[in-house]
Amino acid sequence: MPETERLILRRWEDCDAESLYEYAKDPAVGPICGWPPHQSVEESREIIRNVFTGKEAYAICLKTDNRAIGAIELKLNGRTDMTEREDECELGYWLGKPFWGQNIMPEAVREILRHAFEDIGMTKVWCGYYEGNTRSWRVQEKAGFRYQWTTREVDVPLMHEKRTGHVSALSKDQWQWDRLYAAAAAVRRERTDSEYITCGEVSAAILSGSGRIYTGVCVDTCSTLGICAERNAIFNMITNGEQVIKKVIAILPDGTSGAPCGACRELMVQLMPHEYRSIEIMMDYKKERVVTMGELTPEWWIG
């Protein structure tokens, strides 16, 4: 069952009908998402029984009382027209108005994306919103979704009208790089420990073979004994019993990303002498330019 610090995402039950009706009857909630306000508790119960039946359809509940305050679903192949692939799905969600502005929906979306990519094997998640639903787009933007296209005159059958629809998507690869960048940025803090030592001007994050993220910052000294951020992240990983590296990102002093230094690349080769070529390096985070260690490191350098 997906959950966060504040939330539980659980299956819908008949007893949720009253709570569902309380929030779904609000005209500020459903129409902008493409469905009319609920008219009765009984209608809400029928929707629980006949609509919220998808394998990955969940009620958003606060842990404090387990009461349904919104809905979120990964619409798998057969329940979406955005993709026909078995390893892709569409994300849909809404939240009761009393809970807007509390960062609840971004929290739920982050967890459902983790669930999609790590638990059920999705490689891409699609999402859409209708023109004017800026709250929905902000949630998608916070989660890392990339704009794909706009379609005009889209049928909205439950509202008996046509609208302009916008579509975005997020791949597993993009999601992993976003998490790595955020992890590296979170530990990057330049500081002076003494007149001879400064730390944190450069930070790095590594995605290990197990899917864990390890971070490190650079340690610069007035001698040649400084340690790179990537190397500290690698040592952190080794200390935790791992040695397989999947992805590496280093954030430079100006906030851009760049390649690991020669010494750090040599360490990665030593750790993975037969597989190092497949390690992915983020060269330009904004432009999403990635190279492999094999492309970055010529054979003569290894030999």
Residue ranges, per PLM feature:
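Acyl-donor (CoA/ACP) binding surface of acyl/acetyltransferases
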Residues: 1-28, 61-176
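C-terminal binding/interaction regions
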Residues: 177-194, 243-303
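Short glycine-/small-residue motifs
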Residues: 71, 215-216, 247
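Conserved GNAT-fold acetyl-CoA-binding loop/helix
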Residues: 28-49
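Compact, glycine-rich, soluble single-domain proteins
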Residues: 217-231
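A short helix-loop-beta-strand connector motif used in the catalytic cores of GNAT acetyltransferases and
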Residues: 48-59, 70, 197
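Short beta-strand scaffold segments in enzyme catalytic cores
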Residues: 198, 202-208
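Cytosolic beta-strand hydrophobic patch enriched in CBS
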Residues: 57-63, 205, 281-283
